[in-house]
């Protein structure tokens, strides 16, 4: 991401909602609702204030900075091979995130340089490029200053030698003066004497000035001294303030370290000023070595950037997937750069061992237990006599066969069809429990029936239709006369369909008004609706075909235009004339040759035509009879408007079979889904469902926090009470590692947790109401789909690949099904995972339903037929819709 000057910049993040309009910036894909915000951000991107985060180029627009970053990342995507082994050492066995790893590795590479690298640096305000020779570990600033002084002395000595060679100065005088100076410089003078000498010199000067009568200069000197004293005092005060600030900063850092607060990322280049690390660098142009501090090194060639470091980490290493994962370098690179001897840190040693064990198991290698057993067998065999060599060979062969089997074991879960399901006792596969399919209709149409019932009950407020149980709906469809459930469901569905634009505008609006439908004319409107549907579908198909023809014609024209060349029209015309001429000639030749044959064949052709006409008349008559018979006996076999329209013209609705009625309702439901009312209701449910999910997350977090706080308080109490109890500590040590004592929860916390659990149950019920899409439990090896709904708790439904339906309705059948399913397959593992948490609830509901059925049968067996006829009211007949028209 480009930098705003030198600071990082964040893009605008807006949640895009479907159906709303936004102003979008193309190169950032930012969405803005207000035009003003869009213009302000676009003008900001046009300003030349952006810098490339990779190359460091400045004074760019945002788009130019993005392009420079893209080009730079394409050119250099990995660290050089010279630095790669050092990077691998740094990455191996680290327990940090990818972002932390990139920051730390980038900082590590800025702080360290290695022999052989080409580097640019500054020395005495002059830029040089050279090659690093070595790191000087025991090197100080004093050594650097002495080296600089030696260089200066060497330069000054060269200048003095040039002056001594001149004829004006004799050699003797120079030697004496130099020797005397060296002798004086060798004498040690104390600091106090130096100060006294300075003061004495100043006093002599002052006396001379007094003698000269310069009184004005004395006053000026005193003022200057006073000013200097004041400046010194101010400097001392500033130093004291700086020290106090540094102390405060150190205290703040200690507080931050204690509280473990998140710190802002600091540029590692700023840390180089405090580091004292020196490198010996050889410069080819100068032909000599330079000793340079790390802060004076400007950059290495090729340069290193953060995106490059991130890409190298991704390509070179991978983080283990288990909890508390660490970074692991690819084994090929470890062998290539001889990094096999890297020490594993103590904090990660157990995790590394477990990870290696998992790898061996996945690859099919021997487990630790089997290895130990094989070692014990070998030791026992060696202790035996030589006469038992045959038995040893047999044991070795058996061990080899076991190891081969373990290596051949596949890594589960695998494809369900590939799982070997042969039972060791019987040698056959376990059979699936037989499911019952004694529905009131065909098993292929039962899925449509369930879909219609769920739709009518779920969208009751939109359709204005009171809910009803599945059993009543079954009986209402089977009934030979009108029932309120059947009539109201048809009316409410058609009313929502007539709100569609194809029926609410134009000529259909007059005949298909929502208010015109009643319980008296609903059958007539149903027939008229399907007649209109047939016409509408035919018109739509014609429009589609016309559009396809137009597209084909456009494509042909475009191809012809593309194939045309300059001067090709004349050639085409000539070719056409030639072709026409040839054809004419051929036609003439054929007429001359075949003129004699035509007269002979005329009589034969006339006879054949008469025979064919007679046969066609007979076939037409038979076809018409067959069509009439088919139309009379035609059956609705699918939710198709044409077949439904034909059947409703010739048959009464209540003479139709149950399957035909289900297909009619299924077609009406599919049409109502496209209405605007249903769409708005779905959007509201999605929003409300998201709100409930957020509330649920908050309650779960509260519950976790309560348990953690209670556990922490209990642990503190235990530590205080058990300080002097050595016996309890010894007992805890003797316990196995896996046994963990669950500390009891306090009664106050228990009450709060119960309240939260009740809230969660209420929220789960709300989510079920707002969820429109039904989800299956899963699939088995043969792709059968298993369904369970809380609205229909008495059965587990099974949907086959062909569309047929079955069900299980007892605990024994469910247990047999769980035994039949295999955990080693992908699909069946998921199915078992979804069944197990719901097992207790499903079993309780199945048993409850079976008890109710038994009680009902026993109760009805005691009653006489006369009492049954008098006092039994059928609920599907007495049902009434609470919503008004």
Swiss-Prot record:
Extent of Low complexity compositional bias: 154-180, 380-396
Coiled coil regions in record: 217-260, 530-565, 593-628, 674-782
Residue span(s) of domain WAC: 20-125
Biased composition (Acidic residues): 367-379, 567-577, 604-631, 715-729
A single cellular component GO annotation: nucleus
First-listed, main subcellular location of the protein, grouped into a coarse class: nucleus
Pfam families: DDT, WAC_Acf1_DNA_bd, WHIM1, WSD
Region (Disordered): 141-184, 201-264, 367-431, 562-632, 707-744
Subcellular location: Nucleus
InterPro entries (UniProt xref): DDT_dom, DDT_domain, WHIM1_dom, WHIM2_dom, WSTF_Acf1_Cbp146
The keyword Coiled coil belongs to this UniProt entry's keyword annotation: yes
Presence of keyword Nucleus: yes
Domain of life: Eukaryota
Residues covered by the DDT domain: 443-503
Residue stretches of biased makeup (Basic and acidic residues): 210-264, 578-603
Alphabetical keyword list: Coiled coil, Nucleus
Protein name: DDT domain-containing protein DDB_G0282237
Originating species: Dictyostelium discoideum (Social amoeba)
């Amino acid at each position: 991401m480009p930098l705003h000057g030198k600071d990082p910049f964040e893009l605008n993040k807006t949640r895009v909602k479907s159906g709303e309009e936004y102003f979008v910036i193309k190169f950032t894909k930012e969405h803005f609702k207000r035009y003003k915000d869009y213009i302000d951000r676009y003008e900001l991107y046009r300003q030349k204030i952006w810098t490339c985060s990779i190359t460091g180029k400045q004074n760019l627009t945002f788009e130019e900075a993005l392009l420079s970053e893209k080009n730079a990342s394409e050119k250099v995507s990995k660290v050089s091979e010279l630095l790669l082994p050092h990077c691998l050492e740094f990455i191996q066995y680290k327990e940090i995130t990818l972002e932390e790893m990139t920051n730390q590795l980038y900082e590590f590479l800025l702080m360290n340089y290695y022999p052989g690298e080409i580097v640019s640096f500054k020395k005495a305000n002059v830029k040089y490029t050279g090659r690093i020779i070595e790191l000087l570990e025991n090197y100080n600033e004093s050594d650097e200053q002495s080296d600089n002084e030696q260089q200066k002395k060497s330069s000054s000595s060269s200048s003095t030698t040039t002056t001594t060679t001149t004829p004006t100065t004799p050699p003797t005088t120079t030697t004496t003066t130099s020797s005397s100076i060296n002798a004086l410089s060798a004498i040690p003078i104390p600091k106090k004497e130096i100060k006294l000498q300075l003061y004495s010199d100043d006093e002599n000067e002052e006396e001379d000035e007094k003698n000269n009568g310069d009184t004005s200069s004395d006053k000026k000197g005193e003022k200057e001294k006073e000013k200097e004293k004041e400046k010194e005092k101010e400097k001392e005060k500033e130093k004291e303030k700086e020290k106090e600030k540094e102390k405060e900063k150190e205290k703040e850092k200690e507080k931050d370290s204690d509280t473990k607060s998140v710190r802002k990322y600091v540029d590692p280049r700023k840390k180089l000023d405090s580091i004292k690390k020196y490198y010996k660098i050889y410069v080819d142009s100068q032909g000599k070595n330079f000793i340079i501090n790390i802060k004076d090194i400007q950059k290495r060639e090729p340069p290193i950037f953060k995106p490059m470091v991130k890409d190298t980490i991704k390509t070179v290493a991978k983080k283990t997937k288990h909890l508390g994962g660490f970074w692991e370098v690819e084994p090929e690179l470890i062998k290539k750069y001889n990094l096999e001897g890297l020490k594993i840190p103590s904090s990660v040693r157990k995790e590394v061992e477990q990870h290696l064990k998992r790898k061996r198991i996945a690859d099919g290698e021997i487990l630790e237990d089997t290895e130990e057993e094989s070692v014990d067998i070998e030791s026992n065999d060696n202790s035996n006599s030589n006469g038992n060599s045959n038995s040893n060979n047999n044991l070795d062969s058996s061990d080899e066969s076991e190891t081969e089997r373990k290596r051949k074991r596949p890594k589960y879960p695998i494809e369900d069809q590939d799982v070997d399901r042969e039972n060791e006792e019987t040698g056959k596969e376990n059979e699936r429990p037989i499911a019952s399919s004694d529905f009131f209709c065909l098993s292929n149409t039962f899925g449509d029936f369930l879909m219609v019932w769920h739709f009518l009950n779920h969208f009751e407020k939109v359709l204005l239709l009171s809910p009803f149980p599945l059993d009543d709906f079954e009986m209402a469809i089977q009934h030979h006369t009108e029932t309120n459930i059947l009539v109201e469901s048809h009316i409410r569905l058609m009313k929502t369909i007539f709100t569609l634009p194809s029926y609410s505008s134009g000529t259909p609006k007059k005949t298909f008004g929502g208010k015109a439908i009643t319980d008296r004319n609903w059958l007539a409107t149903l027939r008229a609706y399907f007649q209109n549907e047939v016409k509408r579908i035919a018109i739509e198909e014609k429009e589609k075909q016309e559009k396809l023809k137009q597209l084909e014609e456009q494509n042909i024209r475009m191809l012809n235009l593309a194939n045309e060349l300059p001067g090709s029209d004349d050639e085409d015309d000539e070719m056409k004339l030639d072709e026409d001429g040839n054809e004419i000639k051929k036609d003439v030749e054929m007429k001359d040759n075949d003129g004699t044959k035509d007269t002979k064949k005329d009589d034969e052709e006339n006879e054949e035509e008469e025979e064919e006409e007679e046969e066609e008349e007979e076939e037409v008559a038979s076809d018409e009879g067959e069509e009439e018979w088919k139309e009379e006996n035609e059956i609705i076999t699918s939710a198709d408007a044409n077949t439904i329209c034909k059947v409703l013209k010739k048959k009464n609705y209540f003479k139709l079979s149950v399957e035909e009625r289900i297909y009619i309702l299924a077609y009406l439901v599919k049409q109502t889904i496209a209405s605007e009312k249903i769409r708005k209701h779905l959007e509201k449910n999605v929003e409300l469902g998201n709100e409930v999910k957020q509330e649920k997350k908050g309650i779960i977090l509260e519950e976790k926090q309560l348990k953690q706080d209670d556990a922490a308080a209990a642990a503190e109490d235990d530590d205080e009470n058990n300080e002097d109890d050595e016996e309890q500590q010894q007992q805890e040590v003797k316990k196995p590692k896996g046994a963990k004592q669950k500390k009891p929860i306090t009664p106050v916390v228990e009450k709060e947790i119960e309240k939260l659990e009740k809230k969660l149950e209420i929220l789960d019920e709300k989510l079920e109401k707002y969820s429109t899409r039904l989800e299956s439990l899963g699939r088995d090896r043969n792709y059968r789909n298993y369904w369970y709904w809380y609205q229909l708790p008495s059965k587990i439904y099974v949907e086959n690949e062909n569309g047929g339906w079955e069900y299980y309705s007892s605990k024994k059948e469910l247990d047999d099904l769980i035994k039949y399913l295999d955990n080693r397959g992908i699909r069946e593992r998921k199915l078992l995972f979804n069944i197990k948490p719901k097992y207790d609830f499903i079993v309780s509901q199945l048993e409850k339903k079976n008890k109710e059925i038994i009680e009902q049968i026993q109760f009805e067996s005691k009653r006489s037929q006369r009492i049954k006829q008098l006092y039994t009211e059928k609920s599907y007949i007495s049902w009434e819709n609470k919503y008004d028209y």
